[in-house]
Amino acid sequence: MTRTLSADADTRTATPPLMYVNGEWLPARSGATFPTIEPSTGRPITEIPRGDSSDVDAAVKAAADVAVEWQFTDAITRAALLRRLAELVAENAEELARIESLDSGHYLAKARELVTAIPLWLEYWAGAADKVGGRTIAVPGNKLSFTLLEPLGVTAHIIPWNYPLLILARSIAPALALGNTCVVKPAEDTSLSALKFAELVHAAGFPAGVFNVVTGYGSEAGAALAAHPEVRGITFTGSTETGREIARLGGQHIAQVNLELGGKSPLVVFPDAPLEDAVEVAVQGFCSRAGQVCVAGSRLFLHEDIADRFLEMLVSRLETVTVGDPFDGATQMGPLASKKHYDRVREYIEVGKQEATLLYGGGRPTDTPDDGFFVEPTVFVDVATDARIAREEIFGPVTAVMRWSSVDDLIATINDSEFGLFAVLWCRDITSALDTAKRLQVGSVMINDWFGELPMTPHGGHKQSGTGREEGLEAVHGYTQVKHIGINLEPSPAKSADWAGAPL
């Protein structure tokens, strides 16, 4: 069955979508739907099936029914299907980008950039499919000992709303390449691009049941998926609070759980840093995707020798940032993704006004729709290290500025956080930068560069920023399990009967 989802930049409408389960397009079994909202106007786009536990069960069973067949489909065939999917994504990039802009608020130029990168992930894992394997082990005697890396089986992919399509692709690409079957639950606020992606999976020729999409609320469909006893692996990207609940639900049936969670990432400017470059990265750090980025530079640490000059330059640069309609070519920052999240970010801005000094922003941009979820880039200074805006993840275009003079104190302040996802250092002295990087309790450190997600580099957090890694060959561990096989090449009944060395 063929179904086409489309978005139009002028009408801002999309044809009503259906879920994709076992190769078929289906409504929710209950018949229930819910609206998906355009963030730039606050108006409904279309209705989405409101899947529940019964829909999740059908999708998981479909994935389980073909799990063994897919596991033993040769890696070259799996790779060819992923490459065909990459071709289809490239061919449909403009349509995917427009749907992403419409549904999630990404400004169109950025959405295009993200969508055109997705084939890189699919191609990378297509290339890895027939190259990832176990190892041989040297053991005493005339014996052969080796390991196999086997797929987990059915994997659940619970996708966030900030980068819906990219995170979906980076998650399912290794899972499918390594022989797992997938059930995807996109965020309720941003489901349209996942359903368009399902069309392309279908067109690429993946067998029915290998890839499934169930839409619905996290508390209903998402929780049911994480708790399903036939799900052997769970990948979740989102808040630490929700991640804890996903881990609890998955732990009830001992599923392997991979979590990329919250962050309060520092951007550190050293006294010898090239300030123009550092200012540009600081703006990207908390304004990109309207600050709705797990690695957002929401803590800005400025050395006291350059702080005043840096802040002058920062304000000047922020005055050039255009906030507005994602489909307007001049826009550089779009809206927040939902009304609920908009209200949350505005509450944090009010908290910041009580805790610190507002240097820039703090309100709604002018010339934006009244019902859109727009917030100005916002900078607070004179921020105490124990302030809420310095410690809690806001997930909006808000940064807290703190000054520093001692590297030891700087590192202690950065590490005094429940999060440990990411850090950026701007420093010409590479020895000082490397020493600082080694002492930071985070999963990734970029020196004189901004976060650029790539399929070949591992991404993940320390502490309450998550477990496991997405991307890079390190991601293999999130989608496979080890099997050991030992062979005695000179079996002897007498020796076999000797239990002296047998484990107890």
UniProtKB/Swiss-Prot annotation:
A molecular-function term among this protein's GO annotations: oxidoreductase activity, acting on the aldehyde or oxo group of donors, NAD or NADP as acceptor
What does the entry say induces or represses the expression of this protein?
Induced in the presence of MTBE or tert-butyl alcohol (TBA).
As for subcellular location, the record says:
Cytoplasm
Q: Which InterPro entries match?
A: Ald_DH/histidinol_DH (IPR016161), Ald_DH_C (IPR016163), Ald_DH_CS_GLU (IPR029510), Ald_DH_N (IPR016162), Aldehyde_DH_dom (IPR015590)
Q: Which SUPFAM superfamilies does the entry link to?
A: ALDH-like
Where does the protein principally reside? cytoplasm
Keyword annotations of the record: Cytoplasm, NAD, Oxidoreductase
Per its UniProt entry, which superkingdom is the organism in?
Bacteria
Catalytic-site annotation from UniProt:
260, 294
- The EC number on file is 1.2.1.98
Cellular component annotations (GO), alphabetically ordered: cytoplasm
Catalytic reaction equation(s): 2-hydroxy-2-methylpropanal + NAD(+) + H2O = 2-hydroxy-2-methylpropanoate + NADH + 2 H(+)
The cross-references to Pfam families, in alphabetical order and at most eight, read: Aldedh
**Cited function:** Involved in the degradation of methyl tert-butyl ether (MTBE). Catalyzes the conversion of hydroxyisobutyraldehyde to hydroxyisobutyric acid (HIBA).
Per the record, the similarity remark reads: Belongs to the aldehyde dehydrogenase family.
- The protein's name is Hydroxyisobutyraldehyde dehydrogenase
Organism equals Mycolicibacterium austroafricanum
